[in-house]
Amino acid sequence: MDEVTRTAQRSPSITETHAGETKLAGPGEKEGDVESPVDPSADSEQNRQQITGLQLFAILASVTLSAFLMLLDGSIIGVAIPNITSQFHSIDDIGWYTAAYQLASAALQPLSGKIYSSFSTKWTYLFFFGLFELGSLICGVANSSSMLIGGRAVAGLGSSGLLNGGMTIIAGAVPLEKRPVYTGIYLGISQLGIVCGPLIGGALTEYTTWRWCFYINLPVGAVTAILLLFLQVPELTEKPRFTFALVRRVIPELDLIGFTLFAPAAIMVLLALYYGGNDFPWDSSQVIGLFCGAGVTIIVFALWERRVGDRAMIPPSMVSHRIVYTSAINGAALVASILVAAQYLPIYFQGVRGYGPAMSGVNTLPGILSQLLTVILSGVLVQKVGYYLPFAAAGSAISAVGNGIVTLFSPTTPTAKWIGYQIVLGSGRGIGMQMGIIAIQNLLPPEKISVGIAFMIFCQNFAGAIFVVVGEVIFTQQLVKQIQAHAPSVKVDAALAAGASSSSLRALVPPGSPELQGVLLAFSNSVDRVFYLLMSLSLAGFVAAFGMGWVDTRKKNKSETE
């Protein structure tokens, strides 16, 4: 008996389709409910109106631009922080400008999937986008640090439903066999927001004001919102029209008890990571208490989710399926490595190599462009060959190699090498970026796709938040050791407080001092050590890829058109 059949027999919420792959049952289905060899999602796939031509382009452009703005907003603030803290005299609030955004986004992420599965996709998306735009406006007009933090929290709440909402819209607008291509375009272009943030933010801060780092979302966002208002957005499944009676009926199904347990647990974990080693020692009662509180709350949450079953915010039958959790691990490892690298490559190019913020952004283009090209190309190839697992494994393997060779960066690495190394790294990321999404879309019935995507994006963002902190710990600890070894006359506290710009590093030693090379080597080696972490993450994603299922998506596509 093969692996797929054994899995289907073990899980009462999984049915086997005639295409040969396991598929999670829809609401109310039990094992054995599928009496004929017909995929229950086939009818909805056949009956759903497919969008083509200019309307499809407009929908894809709208959600891609919205996701780009959302990811840009998460990375653009870094270069604006020095000016913000100077105006508000709020150096102690630096961590909260990022933390408020991530905490709010992480807390609402899983619930957003349940909301999409219950209400109109179009209006739910516009609701989350409106929250994001409102948060951007509050940040732009903020007259105090507290107001700015509040605006970041509102924007974070809005961002929780944008990336998964965009993929839900794409899933409803195009047939399954074309989703890899369109999802690749969507992810490839929107992910540019992560790496373009410092470049765009640096230009806006330098030539206008830091407030335009937030104002930029308003006019661009207005265009995308107006487009969506006048476009017909197909649904994955039929949904009733919005009424207050519908709200009263749906609210009990949203698992708000699960949300009230999950949100504090996620917030406590992230707060412990932000406080640990910064405001409080890692072994302090505050940090330990937060971790313990999070652990207890997660246990209670897991017990509650198990009790409510498929009505849960994160259905246990879904997340316990091998394809779902291995896809989540693979995707989380990839996205975490992207987010961490986006922080430390600029340190290498600005601090070690001496480039300004704008040229530092230009120097990362080899990785950005190769990632954009391969994420689209991999989607086309999956559509042709049908199997996503080889691309998931290859993407993680190439990413591991790319992160490994980046550890060879030094203050004197030739231009040809740092360009080539980034091309290898970007290619690996691009190849594997959308494979987890394809696996989940292929596995889940239409009514569960939004929940599955929301769960996966939560795992990616949560892993990113965790490993950004881990990367910071590694970098800081290594910098202390490296400064003592290569520039002993430089005070460690001064090096840690200097920042990572070209001028600040070179100000640590007198002009013409021979120890300047030691300072640059110390920072370069510290960045290299962070990429050892990213290499390990990529290897973890490589191992997880082999659990994502050897499934030919073309068989399902064929069955849905017969």
Curated annotation (Swiss-Prot):
One Gene Ontology cellular component annotation held by this UniProt entry: plasma membrane
Knockout consequences: Leads to an almost complete absence of calbistrin A and calbistrin C, and a decreased abundance of decumbenone A, B and C in the extracellular medium.
Induction: Expression is induced in complex medium (Czapek yeast autolysate medium) supporting calbistrin production. Expression is positively regulated by the calbistrin biosynthesis cluster-specific transcription factor calC.
Compositionally biased residues, Polar residues: 1-16
Keywords: Cell membrane, Glycoprotein, Membrane, Transmembrane, Transmembrane helix
SUPFAM superfamilies assigned: MFS general substrate transporter
Transmembrane is among the record's keywords: yes
Ranges for region Disordered: 1-45
Main localization of the protein described in the UniProt heading: membrane
InterPro entries the record matches: MFS, MFS_dom, MFS_trans_sf
Keyword match DNA-binding: no
Transmembrane segments: 57-77, 94-113, 123-143, 154-174, 184-204, 213-233, 256-276, 284-304, 329-349, 362-382, 389-409, 418-438, 451-471, 530-550
Glycosylated sites: 83, 557
Coiled coil residues, start to end: none
Subcellular locations according to the entry: Cell membrane
Domain of life: Eukaryota
Single GO term (MF): transmembrane transporter activity
A Pfam short name: MFS_1
Practical and industrial applications: Calbistrin A has been reported to possess a number of interesting bioactivities including antifungal active against Candida albicans and cytotoxic toward both healthy and leukemic human cells.
Protein purpose: MFS-type transporter; part of the gene cluster that mediates the biosynthesis of calbistrin A and related compounds. Calbistrin A is a secondary metabolite with an interesting structure that was recently found to have bioactivity against leukemia cells. It consists of two polyketides linked by an ester bond: a bicyclic decalin containing polyketide and a linear 12 carbon dioic acid structure. Required for the secretion of calbistrin A and calbistrin C, as well as of related compounds decumbenone A, B and C.
Family: Belongs to the major facilitator superfamily. TCR/Tet family.
PANTHER family assigned: MAJOR FACILITATOR SUPERFAMILY, MULTIDRUG TRANSPORTER, PUTATIVE (AFU_ORTHOLOGUE AFUA_8G00940)-RELATED
Protein name, entry field: MFS-type transporter calB
Naturally occurring in which organism (per UniProt): Penicillium decumbens
Gene responsible for this protein: calB
